[in-house]
Amino acid sequence: MTIFNRERLTNDVFKIDIKRMRRGWYSDKYFENIGVMLSTLAQQGYVFKGEALRFGDVDLSKTEVGNLEVEMQWFTRRSGKVVVAGVDKVLMMLKHCSGYFNGNGKFVNTWNRLEVEAVHDGATVTYSGDPTSIQPVIRVRGRYRDFALLETPTLGLLTR
C-alpha cells in the first residue's frame, strides 16, 4: 500500500499485458472506434466547423478535433467513505500503454505528454451523493486519443 511509504508500485509487480492492452484487447470496441475516428480526423487536418454558442465569441475555427486535449477524471459514486485501491496499476497502464501506432506499426508512447495527478493506494475519499461534488482519485490531461483505449481496463481495475 503506497499510502504508507508514498512509493508507487511498478509494472515489475503487476506484469501488465502491455502488448495486448495497446491493441485494445481489454477495451470496449467503442473506445477503439473513438481512437480511430480521432486519429483519422487528425490525419485529415479536420478543424471544428460548427458553432459553439456556450463559448460566446471564442473562435473555435482552428480547433483540431482529432488532437483535442481533455481532462479525464476517475472518481467514485459510492456513497460514504471509500478506500482507494488500484491506482498504481492504473498508472502503470497509462505509463506503458498511452500512445498510438505510427504508419510503420511501431508504438509511440505518449505518457510523457500527459499531465497526471493521482492519490495513493490506501487513501480514502468520500461521496455525498451530489454529482457536482466529487473527489477525483486520478486526473489525466492530454490528447484523448492517446489514452481513450484504456478507459475500460482502468475503470475495471478501480471498481473491483
Please place each PLM-identified region on the residue numbering.
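Ordered alpha/beta subdomains of enzyme catalytic regions
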Residues: 1-160
